[in-house]
Amino acid sequence: MKKRLFLFLLALSLVFISGCAHEEEKLSKGLAEGIEKVEVPSTIPSEGLGNLCSGEEECISFCQNNRGQCEEYCGNYNEKTLCQKLFEGNTIPSDIPSCGDKTEFFNAYPIKLSDLEFIRPLGFIGAAPEHIYPTDHVYFFLKKDTSGHAIEVPIYSPGDVWITRIKEIKMEKPVPDSIDYSIYFSPCREFEAFYFHLSTVTEKIKSEIKPPFRYCQEEEIGRFKQVSCEKDVRIKLSAGELMGTAGQLEWQYSFDLGTFDMRTPALDYANPSRWNERQKHIVCPFDYFKGDVKDKIKSRLGENDILRTIEHICGEIEQDEPGTAQGVWFVKDAKMYARPELSLIHDFIDPKIGAFAFGFLPAEIGLSPDVLHFIPKTEGLVNRDFKDVTDDGNIYCYDKLVKQWSYDKKPEQLVVFIQLTSPTTLRIQGKESNSCGSGSWSFSSNYAELER
């Protein structure tokens, strides 16, 4: 009996084990089939700006009315392609022909030479606190009338180009109800140029400035308060074709020309993450003009009757020297689109002159917005060239500082202390005094900490 019961239980166990194995096989097969049936998306989901918006079209629409939120987000995520496109990235339409290896695009004068006083080079600092970081464009200064205001002069296309963007800026101050235009144009896909501060545009251009706009925003920058609207367009112009006029407005003494060549090696900023893609490829506009036109324009680079004679004749936008004090500095934890705080660089006309450019620094440190010059020294701790100041533990002192546009060259009652506390952090403070003395120096509690 026991033997029969044992055989029955053994047979039942075998059936159970066989059934479990079969079910496991079915389950495994089912899982495999399920995995095979999972559909992989054929495209990656469209890029967005975090929780603000998703997809390029939606984000462009959102940022038209919420530009501040978009700027704050992109300040933390500036590597995003969409951020670069929204905020001065390479926005040249892809169907415009490629530049190839061509480097001569322009053969016409932007302005008649008889209407021109001089051309201010790249890298201008001044008009504090508006231009504390070196400017990315040159200035064409216009002839003046007997009252000292710039005359209204025609402005021309320098070559065969497509206008790709237009910004119409309606001023509230300093001249209420006046209009200022910015025109972005390209001869080919990897190269972009712009004119800023045109007072009028031709009807061919003006007829395209209508809704829907890429964005509209209110902004207040220094002495300017304005509402600007930007429009994507496609307008073909020939070399020498009239684009509009500059001058006439009370505050408008010049118009600007800037250029970006996305084929060039990126500029060697100390902290590349601070700058968008276009800013990494700023170039001298006149390197892309032809022959005689190029030579005659470059011969006018300077300030009033003082010509720039030291290379780069066109000026220099990026002066950072990593691991030293030279270059631009930001308050700690500043976003990508931070307001300008500090530049420790060299003059845009005479690079032998050192220049402090103070922007929106804390008031308690004793340095108000200004540009001050000094003669750099190659040794010692007083007035040392910025490129020689490293994190060596020393405090450096600067005296006999002269205002940028000072006619009598009388030194200010001010000395400035700086110290590189690491290769990427800087301490700075001002003190009312006419001389550094013989040292040594120390900071009080009211100093500012900046970083690359």
Which ranges hold each PLM region?
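Beta-sheet ligand-binding and adhesion/scaffold domains
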Residues: E379-R452
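Secreted, short cysteine-rich peptides and small extracellular cysteine-rich domains stabilized by multiple disulfide
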Residues: L49-C83
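Surface-exposed, glycine-biased beta-strand/turn segments
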Residues: Q84-S182, S186-R189, G222, K236-A239, ...
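Bacterial signal peptide processing site
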Residues: A21-E23
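Short histidine-centered loop motifs in beta-beta connectors
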Residues: G148-I151, Y156, P187-L242
